[in-house]
Structure formats: C-alpha cells, structure tokens
C-alpha cells in the first residue's frame, strides 16, 4: 500500500487552469552544472553567515550565536543537490510540480488576512508586501514571490551552493535580475538565528518556510525565530511532512526507494513533525494556526493536488497576534 502516492490522486488527472498556469513564467530546463558556481566565491561571506572561503582568507570567520537550528549533515546534502535543483525533470521534479500549489495557497490565505493583498491586482497579488523565504534552496518559491510583485523578497539559506545557484539563475531573467539590482530581491547565506541577531526587527508581512522544518535541528527554536521576524498581524507559512506510519510508507519507502522520485536520504522519519507539535510551538509565540491543508502526490501522473488528509504532506498558515 503506497497510500497517497497512488490511490486518491489517480482520480485527479485534470487540473484547473488557474493552477496549471500559475507561475507560468517559471523557467524550464535551465540546468546548471556544479561548475557554474566556481567563479562566485565573492558571495561566500556576508555579515549574516560566514564560511571558509577557497581564497587565502585567514580572517576570524565565526558565527555569533551559541545555539543553532542548523544541521550540518542536511546542509552538506543539499549543497550536493544544488546543481540539479533547477532541472524540472531532475531530482527535484516533485518540488517543481508542487510550487504552483504552494504559491496559490500563500496568495489565497493572504487575500483573506491581509488588506493590501485583497485590494491588489490579480497579476500582482503581493504588491506592497515584505516577504522572506527561509530555507529558500535555489529560489523556486523565492522567484515566484518576487514575480508576484512583493516590494521586498529575501531568500535565506544556510547552504552556500544553493545561494550561489539562486543568484545565478535569477540573473538569466531580465525582471528578476532588475529586482536583484534594485534590492527588491535579495539572497543571503545565513541561518535564521544569525539573520535575526543582526536584523533584530519584526519586518516581514509574510514569512515562508516550505519543506524546511523537517531538515532543521530544534524545530521549536526554529519556529521561535520565524515568529520574531514577522510583524504583528503578519502571516507564517509552513509546509512539511506529518510524522505518521503512512508518511514513512509514502515519503520515504515510496518516494525514495520505490519510485525514486527524490534522492535516497532526502528525508528522515524521526525529523517529521506532527501538526499538534507545531500548534504548540506557535501558541508559545503568540501565533495562531488559521488553516491546515494536505497535499497529495501521484507518481504516475507526477501531479499534486490539495486534500483534507494531513497524514503525509501538509501546509499551514499561522497569524501572529
């Protein structure tokens, strides 16, 4: 039984045009080799997060925090995957197919809870908003947020190769490159705690962290920091995988070993997280979950769909009081 991976979603082969056409401008088949980041070492160090450079730089590069949400094994893993991440038919194909659903969910929820979004034009629903994508990877979601008109978009990731690839990919698109030049789109190599310790400000209308929390150390602390950087009345969006028997069958055995949809080792069941645990973490930060929505993937059609079943993948929306 591969539960969500085969069953219900087989009945959903036709997608609404709104979803199929959402983020239509997302690039197809711009595939980079690992050599594309070789000339970009100037991006390695910044005030938020420092690492050892390949150049002869022997300065004291240390982080400023004593505790961290970073798991170095996860960073190493995703650094290795970065060169194939923008290939829509590669190892991240399920994530490419998921992205329009994630964006639709974010826009739909913001339209309900943010007055600016409810009045914005349909093609620029995020106009006037400051948004951050924490754990942005190579920028799949970040680029979409920038295209949809957000005044300020920050893509934050602790994996150096991901940030280099995100900057490189955006530079091939005229609009995104303009956004980088005028600082309305900014990619930073940093952990969430280092970013907060420097900025120390509730500055974002929306904080997004999708398919990330199951890869961090100390998820409670991670939610603490997400809650600190969102404005009162602002939104936090999380997507992750529930910690159930069915999620082990689907997301690990099915996705990694049977269907080979993602590389083996992408997920670890002990790092999956139940909605009730996230609810507790948000409650302790004066935030309230307003919505939970499941996502189901059909490996036969390579398509996602929304569902009310939260046993495997799910999205949530929380509001800071």
From Swiss-Prot:
Main location: mitochondrion
Domain of life: Eukaryota
Membrane topology per record: Peripheral membrane protein
Miscellaneous: This protein may be expected to contain an N-terminal transit peptide but none has been predicted.
Needed cofactors: Mg(2+)
Recorded metabolic or biological pathway in which this protein acts: Cofactor biosynthesis; ubiquinone biosynthesis
PANTHER family documented for this protein: METHYLTRANSFERASE, UBIQUINONE BIOSYNTHESIS O-METHYLTRANSFERASE, MITOCHONDRIAL
Family to which the UniProt record says this protein belongs: Belongs to the class I-like SAM-binding methyltransferase superfamily. UbiG/COQ3 family.
Organism: Dictyostelium discoideum (Social amoeba)
Protein name: Ubiquinone biosynthesis O-methyltransferase, mitochondrial
Single annotated GO MF: 3-demethylubiquinone 3-O-methyltransferase activity
Keyword Phosphoprotein: no
Protein EC: 2.1.1.64, 2.1.1.-, 2.1.1.114
């Amino acid at each position: 039984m591969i539960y969500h991976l085969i069953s219900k979603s087989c009945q959903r082969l036709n997608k609404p045009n709104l979803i199929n056409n959402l983020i239509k401008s997302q690039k197809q088949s711009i595939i980079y080799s690992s050599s594309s980041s070789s000339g970009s070492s100037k991006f390695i160090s910044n005030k938020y997060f420092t690492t050892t450079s390949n150049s002869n730089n022997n300065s004291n590069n240390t982080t400023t925090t004593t505790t961290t949400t970073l798991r170095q094994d996860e960073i190493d893993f995703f650094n290795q995957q970065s060169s194939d991440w923008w290939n829509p038919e590669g190892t991240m194909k399920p994530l490419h197919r998921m992205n329009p659903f994630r964006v639709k969910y974010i826009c739909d929820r913001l339209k309900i809870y943010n007055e600016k979004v409810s009045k914005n034009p349909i093609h620029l629903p995020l106009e006037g908003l400051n948004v951050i994508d924490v754990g942005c990877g190579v920028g799949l979601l970040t680029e979409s947020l920038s295209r949809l008109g957000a005044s300020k978009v920050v893509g934050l990731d602790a994996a150096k190769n991901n940030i280099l690839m995100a900057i490189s990919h955006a530079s091939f698109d005229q609009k995104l490159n303009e956004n980088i030049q005028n600082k309305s789109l900014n990619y930073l190599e940093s952990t969430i705690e280092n970013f907060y310790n420097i900025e120390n400000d509730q500055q974002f209308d929306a904080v997004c962290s999708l398919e990330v929390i199951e890869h961090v150390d100390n998820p409670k602390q991670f939610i603490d920091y997400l809650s600190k950087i969102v404005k009162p009345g602002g939104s936090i969006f999380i997507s992750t995988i529930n910690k159930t028997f069915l999620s082990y069958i689907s997301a690990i055995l099915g996705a990694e070993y049977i269907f080979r949809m993602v590389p083996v080792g992408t997920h670890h069941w002990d790092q999956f997280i139940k909605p009730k645990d996230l609810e507790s973490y948000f409650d302790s930060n004066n935030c309230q979950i307003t919505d939970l929505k499941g996502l189901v993937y059909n490996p036969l059609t390579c398509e996602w769909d929304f569902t009310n079943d939260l046993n495997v993948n799910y999205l949530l929306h929380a509001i800071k009081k």
